[in-house]
Each structure stands twice: as structure tokens, then as C-alpha cells.
């Protein structure tokens, strides 16, 4: 790498690096870095955390490749009798490091920390150079339904210790491991395993001291142990003790004990190193019939999956953002989280301990096990790093190591299947063995997708089977979910199960009175969760669930209604809650009243003031009253924490208030909703129609609402003949993609009855007759119509031929939106758009009418 000269003039003084006591000193060195991609020579000043993939928010083919980071700093004096370490909390997905021109090490894996001893290379003036590469195919994951963010996106630490210290080179851990092999209400056993390194040139006699403080900060026990460590060696010592009447940890009462571990010289009393950890005493079990239990009592796991990105910073989040997410998840009523699909920041796991969330953490082995040299070794290293780095966290109850690993594997009818099956099972067996050797006290878990092959080929070797089920979204009907779980339990009644993923996408621009799977309406997502959640809650053998996903998260390869986004979240990417999140809160929060008018995602509607408009309410109250503009509409008793009032609304704004009582105290929620009248062409309104769709679409750019399609009736408007079609492929050259992802095919005409006059008629189209190949895990229900090499048709409006021998593919409009406007004379009190098919199939995706 080219060394920076004039640019790297910023120096970092580490005053206080050498403290009077020889104890550990840790400092972040996140500021003052310079960065460039391999494709450019232009260095840019940056701070870490940093990612070089903000392009993933705007383009499918985001940058995959190498990038370089460089930083210079000065030490006031070279630390004699000290050891210096460089720790990077994460760099994705491979990193090569040099210090002062000398290579100090490499790391393969984008989600775990790694530490190097830089003592031999440190001097007064120092330059760190780090090459990061997010494109490596020999490092897991090789494919996934999330963006492979590149960069140094977590903290960088400079650590100094004495020559005798706890081992910092054990897979990114700090060399201290705390377990609680036995816990009950009367007594708990704690075991502390410490690794001590002597980097001096002489043998050292040392003492390890563990001070155990209870949750109130009172010293409970002091454990001491002497040892002798030869020069240049690392020695492991164990100390076990009993804690009487332990204060148990649970999500409701996350009581944490603090353990301060000190290494000292017993002759001089000098403190050489110190490390502080927190632990909690709890015991748990998974059972195939009775589900999950915590501290001896039945306990339903209620949670979400969590990805770690947030626009506009990608995955380069600060600690406060991680803690905020756990707080939001906890406030929603969760007691459980699946940290998916990779190990996440220490701040997040610490927050789980402190705020009370049980956790499943996993490494990112996803979709398929490739036939790639070194891949299995890399997976095992990833697993070992995750377990050792987060071993001490009481919130973690399960380690996972594969997600939907057969999703893109060849089917059993393919010649490649036997070899793929063998690779997959062999790796699973290897990782299961490693997991149990590393941590015999937690459960192993794997997430299966919707096939029984996992049971048939031996991937059910884990303690708990997780099912990623999307019946009623990607496949089948909602009731198929119930049938699937009932069938699995009948076949394998002793096997513990959890619903590790389930979810439906939603786009706040889309609303439907008749929601259906894959329309991406806010209403279908609500319908979906209102079916799944009561079944999960009411089925004893299901240990619990983690909804997919906590947030709308970035997937550069995703298309659908919101390209670059998986929009199944209960919160938007900016962490604003969707209405549907309050359904979970109403179902799960027993400690506080919940009352929410679920119309924040649909605050502006278009319709007739005499028709009924649904107003949904999520609540855990026994009864709720709805008041509109000061007038009571009535009271209803919710079923499964939701109810719908069908009400008439005046045009303009209305104040809606829902109220009820909990323990004699009034609870209320208030919002303002606006009803706009149906467009009146005679008054100059624009009539915009989302052809081929049952959804209304409101543009977030113009604010214009495109009404759902309907068949023509006299005095109104609508289609004449034709079949509704849809696609999940991205439509380019527009921000209003959903308008072009549904269309009516082979329609004879579209007619709008309107007063005579001059009109502007705008037709929306795209070349939707051909499908763009999608990634295997980007499933969908869009039928894309029938693939037609070329479709040609004539279009006539009010007797005037406006397009002759026309094809949407003309002019390179493949999957690209285009709109054409025509000035038309309406002389017969109707605007009729006639289609004459010459070849293939005609179609229309949208139409807008305006009287001039």
C-alpha cells in the first residue's frame, strides 16, 4: 500500500498510556483515519466505525472488493516492560494488517473481533495500515439476503498491559470465561476459567483474585488462587464456588452479579491486570411437548430477529444505537431476540444482559455449503470466536450455526445432491461437536426453511429445531402454517421447536380493503401477524418465536415494492414503529395498558363520506370506546388484542380518540385522520388509478393517491375485460415502483365516464412481459404474466389513434417505467381507451386523467 506522507500528519498522543500501576489500559483509536477504495488513489479522512458500502442503499451492484485504511499516531515513549495489543471489534469480511511496514496478521470473518500483539512492531512514530475485503468467497457467508457491508465498522482499540496479563489472543476474547453449571433457587455454582500469559523472560509467581458482587453492589465472595507461569507460556486455572440463595436473572428481573478479576504480584501487591464481567444466575430447558422453561417455570419466548443496519450509516452504528434497539425491542414486549444472522456488537449483547432479553446468537452459514477449500475451517473458527467472545453473557441461551442451509442446494433429483448433502451434514456434525466442546451449558440451534429434508438427512442433530416459515406470504395460505407445525409435532413429538422466522412485507404507500399475500399493503402484514401470533401463543409445544424482522433492513439485491429493502420490519429503518408493532405490544405486554389506533400508517384516505371506513385498534384492554370529533361511535370488546370499528367520516380532518380502563384508570390514544373526497373531474381533480391492483398507492414524492382498480360500471370508471397480473421485479427509472408492478393484461378498454371537454390522459406502462432472474432466496408470488418475446398493440383514445404498432419494449424500456400524456377531446361524455392487440398481449399499469 502506498504510504501516506503529508496527509497523515495528525498525531495521537497517548498520555497516560504508562500508568503508575501496571494494570491494563484501553483506548479507542477511532478518529483520524484515512481511507480509499482499491479503485481509486484518492484518500479521504474518516472516523471508524465506517463502511464503504453506502452505495448499497441506491444500487444493486454495490462495491465488492478491497479498501484500505491508514492511521498514524505517536506514543510519548516506547512502552518498556509493557505489551501492546491492537483489537478490532469487526472488519468485513477479511482484514490484513501491517504496522510500520511489517505485517502483523490477518483475519477472515466479518462479524467477530480479533486481536494482535503489536509489541514487537511498536515505536514512537507509528502507522497502521489495514486492507479490508468484502468480496472473499472462501469466507462465510458466500450468499445471503442481506448486504455484505465492507469496512472497519466497529471500534478499534489500543490496549496496553503488563508483561503478565490475561490472555488477549484467544480468538478475540479476554481470556476469562464464566459459567454457571448448576443453578436453582437455593444455590448456584459458578466456575471461572482464567488464562494467564507471561510474556516476560523469567518465570513468574502470580495470584488471581475474583471478587463477586451481588446485584446491589455488595461483596459476596473473594476467591484467590496462586500459580506459577513459565516465561513465554499461557496457563489456565479454574476456580469454582457456590453462591447461596442466588438472585435469579430473568427478562423481568435482569439481576446481574459483577465479577472483578485481578492479576497481581503476590510479593509486591502490584496489580498487573484487571478485567470486569457481569453474569446472571438462571437455568432453562427446551422440551418437545412443554416448550421452553426458565428458572423452573413455563416461559414462552417472544421476540424478533435483528439486523444491524440503519440509513444513512449502514452498519457503522455507535454503541448508543445498539442499546436503543434493545430498548425498543424490550418496550414492545419482547423477552427474546435472535441476533441474526451473525455475531453483533458487544454493546448489543451487554444491553440484552442489562435490560433483560434472552438471546440466540449465530454465525452466518447461509443457503448452501460450498465445495470450497478452507470454507469448513473458516466456519469452525467463526463459531469458536463467537462463543468465546460472548461466552460470559447470561442472556445467551442458544448458539446457532446454519440458516436455511438447503435453500439454494441442488434438489435430491440432481446429480450434485449427494455430494452437497454429504458436505452439509459433515460440516454440521463438526460444528455441533465444536459447539458442545466450547459450551456444554447452552443449546445448539439451526434454522430450517420449508422442507422436510432437514429431518431426513440428519440436520436435526441440534438441540432445538428452528423453523423459518412463510406460509401465506411466499407460499400457500395462512392456515398452512398451522398444518405444518401440527404435522411436524405429530412426526417428532419429542423435538423442541421454535419459529425462528415468520413475516410479511409492508409498504406504507400501499393500502387495501381487500389485502392479499404479496401485495405489500400495510393491511396484509397486519392480517398475517394476526393469524400467526395467536396460534404460536396458544400452542404449548412451540417454545416461542422471533418475528422477521425488527426493522426494514437493507438488501442491495432486493427488488419488490421497495428496491434495496426487505420491508418485513415491525419498525421502519429509522426506528419509527409501524402500527403493526403495537399488536405485538398488546399481545405481549401484561405489565402496562396498551391502546393504539392503528391508522398512523394510513392517516390520509380517499373515499366517500357515506361509506364505511375501517379503524383498527390494538389493545390489551377488555373494552375500548371510539370517539370521533367528540361523538362516541360505541364500545367493542377486542378479540386477540384487536378490534375494528367500521365508521363514516366527514371530509377533511377528524380527531379520533380511543379510550378504555385498566385497573380503574382511564387510558386513551388520540390521532388525526383525513378523508379526501373521490376525485371529481368536473372540478379539475386528477383521477389516478393503480391499474391491476386492489391497493391504493400514495406517492411519497407528489402525495397523489392512485386508487385501486375496479371493473367499469355506468357513470363511473374502470377496466373492461383483461386479467390482473403482477411482478416482484424492480421497475427502474421511477420512485413509484408499485404503480408498474401490477397491470391489467389483454384488456379491451379502460373507460372513464366524464363530462365533455379537453382532457389530459396519461398512460403508465413498462415492459413487464419478461422476467429478470432473481436470487433464489428472493422468493415471491408475482406471476410476471406469460413471457412474450414481443407484444405489439394499437391504442385509441376517444376515437383518436395515439399509438400504432406499439410495444412497451420499444426504446429499451425493459423493466423501466415510462409515462405518456395525450391531449384528448372528449365529445361523448366518456373517455374510452381502446386496446387492439396485434401480437402477444397488451397491458396497462396505470392511468391518470385531468380536465384542462
List each language-model region with its residue ranges.
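Accessory beta-strand-rich segments of carbohydrate-active enzymes
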Residues: 36, 64-169, 173-175, 199, ...
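An acidic-aromatic loop/edge-strand motif
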Residues: 29-32, 51-58, 118-190, 275-283, ...
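Surface beta-strand/loop "capping" patches
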Residues: 165-199, 585-620, 679-685
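Extended carbohydrate-recognition surfaces in non-catalytic/accessory domains of CAZymes
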Residues: 22-89, 140-143, 149-152, 169, ...
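Extended acidic/polar, glycine-enriched regions
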Residues: 120-125, 193-287, 644-646, 650-653, ...
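Extended substrate-binding grooves/exosites of carbohydrate-active enzymes
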Residues: 48-59, 102, 135, 145, ...
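Compositionally biased, intrinsically disordered or flexible polar/acidic segments
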Residues: 676-852
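Accessory carbohydrate-binding/adhesion or oligomerization-edge regions at the termini
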Residues: 21-60, 74, 127, 131, ...
